[in-house]
């Protein structure tokens, strides 16, 4: 069934989703008049979008029921988390962020507020540059904030968008998993479960770009995987490179390498492989210049320095484990409510530590041969996270989600005992 979806048909499905992303907030805007009603309007908007995505790509009634459950469950998780840890009186207020938040949370919300004000005076297509936005990656926030020009710019209204984004990512990854002949049914079930309830995206009650950015990258990966002609491949690469750059500057390099890898891996001719290597080096230098010009010297030094490589084995272990010990969560929350979002980092660390143990324990049977574009991209993002000076678990988990089909095919249902071992620690 999934083999019937071609590059062109998937592109048509994307246009339908994009059209609804534009139209639904406008249609629901009359109902978004207060904190409660605007939150409900946002939930309805992105619930419809989620169901449409599942219907268009996965099609089966089982998947529709499953993702309905996943959407509602994640909305409840985010709502309970915010009301319990942050602001129990949120819905009787104006929907503004808590004044106790860290500076970066407040400046992001303030930047979006200024963007919405500029749109009201200059039109919906007003574009703020980085200097005016005064926050990193302003490009992606123009898309993230669009629905809330109509549904009101309130903190919790972004929660349903985060849920939709994470579930659309899950749909795309599971779709590619089902198209692969090397993934068995047991592995597919694990991929479906873990991607739809991915620990790093469970606490959706905040304004951040990661769920939406990773969703866009997953769309790019599907386009690359479905492309056959040279035009389709070039178009897919451009799309993936742009959205990867929007999410995190260094990801444009990884998008280029992962796109190039598929052609290189399939080619048997040595001369052609050498030609691909030559083209790859040229492309790498060109993309590297783009990232260097977009970042400060200090930021670039965080990725390219000797210590990053020398300390890589240790950084891999600590990056996979995340914040530790996990029992420090309750003490941290007392210091600042923003630490309450680290709960998903602890959950992600537990999952990733089990992932690491499983690979070490099964290293003799684990195969890194014939990796597909999605897996290469995932490992590339993980590596960039390990090498970065500002390493934190989110940088690693953004890549790890793309490696799950490969990982569960390697360890299969045996992962459960490694997860339990990690959880016990």
In which residue ranges do the predicted regions lie?
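Transmembrane-helix signature of polytopic, membrane-embedded enzymes
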Residues: 156, 173-196, 369-373
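Short acidic/glycine- and proline-prone juxtamembrane loop motifs at membrane-interface regions
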Residues: 205-212
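Transmembrane-helix motifs of polytopic, lipid-linked glycan transferases
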Residues: 48-55, 146, 160-182, 357-358
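Alpha-helical transmembrane segments and terminal signal-anchor/GPI-anchor hydrophobic tails
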Residues: 233-368
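Loop-to-helix entry region of an early transmembrane alpha helix in multi-pass inner-membrane enzymes
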Residues: 131-145, 150-171, 342-349
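Short hydrophobic/aromatic helix or loop-helix immediately within or flanking a transmembrane segment
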Residues: 103-153
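Transmembrane alpha-helix segments characteristic
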Residues: 15-22, 365-385
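Membrane-interface transmembrane helices that cradle and orient dolichyl/undecaprenyl
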Residues: 181, 217-233, 411
């Amino acid at each position: 069934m999934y083999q019937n979806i071609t590059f062109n048909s998937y592109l048509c499905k994307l246009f339908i989703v994009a059209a609804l992303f534009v139209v639904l907030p406008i249609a629901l805007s009359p109902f978004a008049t207060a904190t409660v009603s605007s939150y409900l309007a946002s939930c309805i908007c992105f619930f419809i979008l989620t169901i449409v995505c599942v219907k268009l790509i996965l099609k089966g009634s089982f998947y529709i029921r499953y993702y309905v459950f996943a959407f509602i469950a994640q909305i409840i998780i985010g709502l309970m988390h915010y009301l319990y840890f942050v602001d129990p009186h949120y819905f009787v207020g104006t929907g503004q962020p808590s004044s106790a938040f860290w500076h970066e949370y407040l400046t992001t919300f303030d930047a979006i507020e200024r963007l919405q004000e500029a749109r009201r005076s200059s039109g919906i297509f007003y574009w703020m540059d980085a200097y005016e936005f005064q926050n990193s990656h302003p490009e992606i926030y123009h898309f993230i904030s669009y629905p809330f020009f109509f549904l009101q710019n309130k903190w919790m209204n972004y929660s349903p968008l985060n849920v939709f984004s994470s579930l659309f990512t899950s749909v795309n990854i599971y779709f590619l998993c089902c198209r692969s002949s090397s993934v068995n049914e047991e592995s597919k079930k694990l991929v479906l479960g873990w991607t739809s309830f991915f620990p790093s995206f469970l606490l959706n009650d905040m304004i951040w770009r990661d769920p939406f950015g990773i969703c866009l990258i997953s769309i790019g990966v599907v386009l690359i995987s479905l492309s056959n002609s040279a035009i389709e491949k070039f178009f897919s690469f451009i799309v993936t490179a742009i959205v990867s750059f929007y999410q995190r500057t260094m990801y444009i390099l990884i998008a280029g390498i992962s796109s190039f890898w598929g052609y290189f891996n399939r080619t048997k001719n040595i001369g052609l492989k050498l030609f691909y290597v030559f083209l790859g080096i040229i492309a790498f230098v060109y993309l590297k210049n783009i990232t260097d010009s977009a970042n400060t010297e200090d930021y670039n030094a965080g990725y390219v320095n000797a210590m990053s490589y020398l300390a890589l084995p240790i950084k891999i272990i600590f990056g996979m484990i995340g914040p530790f010990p996990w029992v420090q969560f309750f003490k941290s929350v007392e210091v600042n409510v923003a630490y309450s979002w680290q709960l998903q980092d602890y959950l992600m660390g537990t999952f990733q530590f089990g992932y690491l143990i499983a690979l070490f324990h099964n290293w003799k049977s684990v195969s890194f041969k014939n990796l597909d574009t999605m897996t290469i991209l995932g490992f590339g993002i993980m590596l960039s996270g390990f090498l970065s000076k500002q390493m934190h678990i989110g940088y690693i988990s953004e890549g790890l989600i793309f490696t799950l089909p490969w990982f569960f095919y390697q360890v299969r249902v045996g992962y459960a005992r490694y997860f339990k071992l990690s959880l016990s620690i």
